[in-house]
Amino acid sequence: TTTTPPSTPPLDDPATDPFLVARAAADHIAQATGVEGHDMALVLGSGWGGAAELLGEVVAEVPTHEIPGFSAPAVAGHLSVTRSIRVERADGSVRHALVLGSRTHLYEGKGVRAVVHGVRTAAATGAETLILTNGCGGLNQEWGAGTPVLLSDHINLTARSPLEGPTFVDLTDVYSPRLRELAHRVDPTLPEGVYAQFPGPHYETPAEVRMAGILGADLVGMSTTLEAIAARHCGLEVLGVSLVTNLAAGISPTPLSHAEVIEAGQAAGPRISALLADIAKR
């Protein structure tokens, strides 16, 4: 008796072009939402989910796991639907925003292609702007839980890249100075900082946090940098915003827990969601 081997998920097959999978995902989104193209995309991390309701009219929702290349979210606090939202800008014009509701983390073991599939799908829908958000640990004791911080740069400590082959992308301004200036017009008090991504899923040790600080990091987390790299490769203009949900290990007097991250995100949710919606409408 012979058994049929399980089918290989497209992104796991080295012979598969990940950009073709992203194109298929974009086509599925267009058909499911009735929106031919999107102007911008948002990835809402821990604590940021409420921003979707404040952006504008939800045109359609698509279960994320039904879109080619995506799977259900593995982390509590992350959305499981992808939304197309009609956004009325401050100048009266209308844009369509794609809110990606399922972020894949590197620690899930699905590979780097899966981590950046949402970003490549956003680009395939026509998006020119990408807003990446996350919940993170803070090294600056002046930034208490609930503080939003604009990303000015990042340090990729995953030892991985989403790019394959001789793809040499300039990351000098990976986080758009223009978009950061726009965000400061919405809230001049927003601080800026450098974000360091660790692989996870375990939290950083106090020694690792000290190392990150010596390297120049102000924030530590487990997402965002690989997505930002892929976004720049696709030609997207990127804005990164972190929500400090806790002080990092060795700085915080208490042990870290994911429940703490979710609780801090929920407490800050209304304020940071309104901030993000205001920025997106610009």
UniProtKB/Swiss-Prot annotation:
Catalytic activity: a purine 2'-deoxy-D-ribonucleoside + phosphate = a purine nucleobase + 2-deoxy-alpha-D-ribose 1-phosphate
GO biological process: nucleoside metabolic process
Xref: PROSITE patterns: PNP_MTAP_2 (PS01240)
Annotated Gene Ontology cellular component terms: cytoplasm
Residues passing through the membrane, by range: none
Binding annotation for phosphate: 46, 78, 103-105, 223
Keyword tags: Glycosyltransferase, Transferase
Example GO molecular function: purine-nucleoside phosphorylase activity
Pathway annotation: Purine metabolism; purine nucleoside salvage
InterPro entries per UniProt: Nucleoside_phosphorylase_d, Nucleoside_phosphorylase_sf, PUNP, Purine_phosphorylase, Purine_phosphorylase-2_CS
Keyword set includes S-adenosyl-L-methionine: no
Domain of life: Bacteria
Enzyme class name: transferase
Amino acids binding a purine D-ribonucleoside: 204, 246
Matches recorded under Gene3D superfamilies: Nucleoside phosphorylase domain (3.40.50.1580)
EC number assigned by the record: 2.4.2.1
NCBIfam families, alphabetized: PNPH-PUNA-XAPA (TIGR01697), PRK08202.1 (NF006054), PUNP (TIGR01698)
Family, similarity comment: Belongs to the PNP/MTAP phosphorylase family.
Function: The purine nucleoside phosphorylases catalyze the phosphorolytic breakdown of the N-glycosidic bond in the beta-(deoxy)ribonucleoside molecules, with the formation of the corresponding free purine bases and pentose-1-phosphate. Cleaves guanosine, inosine, 2'-deoxyguanosine and 2'-deoxyinosine.
PANTHER family on file: METHYLTHIOADENOSINE/PURINE NUCLEOSIDE PHOSPHORYLASE (PTHR11904), PURINE NUCLEOSIDE PHOSPHORYLASE-RELATED (PTHR11904:SF9)
Subunit structure: Homotrimer.
Protein's name according to its UniProt entry: Purine nucleoside phosphorylase
Protein source organism: Cellulomonas sp
